[in-house]
Amino acid sequence: MEKEKDIAVELGRDAAEGLGAKKYKPLVYIVAFTAALAGLLFGLDIGVISGALKFIAKAFSASTLQQEWVVSSLLFGAVGGTLISGIISKKYGRKNTLLIAAVIFSLGALLSSISTSIGILIGCRVFLGFAVGMASFTAPLYLSEIAPRGIRGALISMYQLMITIGIVCAFLSDTFLSTYFKFHGIVGGHWRIMLGILIIPSMIMFIGVFFLPKSPRWLMLKGRKKAARRVLSKIRNTEEEIAIELEEIEENLEEKQNGWAMFKVNKNFRKAIFLGIGLQLIQQLTGINVVMYYAPKIFQAAGFGSSAEQMWGTVLVGVVNVLATFIAIAFVDRWGRKPIMYTGFAIMGISMCIVGIAMPSHAELAAAAGHIPTRAFISIAGIFTFIIGFAASAGPIIWVICSEIYPLAGRDFGITCSTATNWIANGIVGLTFLTMLKGLGATTTFLIYGGVEVIFIIFFILWVPETKGISLEKIAENLLAGKPLKKIGL
């Protein structure tokens, strides 16, 4: 009887999201875009530090280690922001957590821009990191709980798209402020303005999020079924669709334990937690933020000597990153998550190896006497193909999968663990790259990053599920029923 009921629910859900429901309400896209502005703030900070670092180092006579800490301090602050977000988000809601993050981001940007020493700047960036961590935790979670299942992958991918747009906007701003802008008679190098200008988008995010509806799943978690129905009525097409979704959420809420309690006693939930941790480790160990944080230094290592060449090359990196993200948005709900990931890892692995092999040595650059060797152009081409591979796959899709694989009662805990892992790994990458580049050389450093992509393909084959077109509640049901991880999306 229970099996027949499940079949009936599946048939009803398919009918509700059938041909007549292919067109989604415009409000769905407006809500998703506004929530994804959290990704814009994240991207702006990744991009802005790339261009500002050279001038910060000059202003404070910062050592290599201090420069690494300027980059990584925000990332370790983001770990703290992520860890407290699970508690805040569950108690006060996804929307309110995003509002708090916007306020902290504004304050952090202001304080960073008026720092009077390298130590104070590092401390301010830790504070700013709390906001970035809170936003990176909450935005994909909110998007997954708002989105219809038929376009869930695309809408969550909008978060990564906004990250890439933020990066390219910051690169453009940095290029203008570092090369052309005249202030108090000084042309270029205005790192304080680079950092302080981030106040503007954080205020825009606050205003936009203020008008968003609350997550219907969070409302149901708080026993507010009528409010959840009202929200769903604005973003779903039919009463049948709303009724089915509410029924699924109620069934999922029959699991009364919280995330930590589930982790201690439920081995199936533990598997999902470790999968999420593994996925976020993978995203960072691809080496993407090596390129994003240190793009000007990579261009310099390749033989592009002038600041203008380095900054405009960095802008082009950001533009390619944005454009390639549209590949994931277009195909993640058509082709599925895993086929795109396999292709992306292959492209990234080959590209990093090309970068490592083709990167000219110091001796070659010295012998070139100011001319850029052909090998330098090959290595930079490898950087661009790597960006395409990442932006079309691991960039958005890992955020998608990590927002899908946890049951509602443990979703805050699960996303806390996976997102905190992302920031820890991100911080380690940011803190070690310049040291690796100096100690191992460019060739060995990039070959190491290229080699690990093969391991990631094996990881996806063995453990990662395909979640295309499956409701969050069905994925949770399969997980808690003890299905193997790679089959919880079937």
Predicted regions and their residues:
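Short helix/loop segments within enzyme catalytic domains
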Residues: 233-239
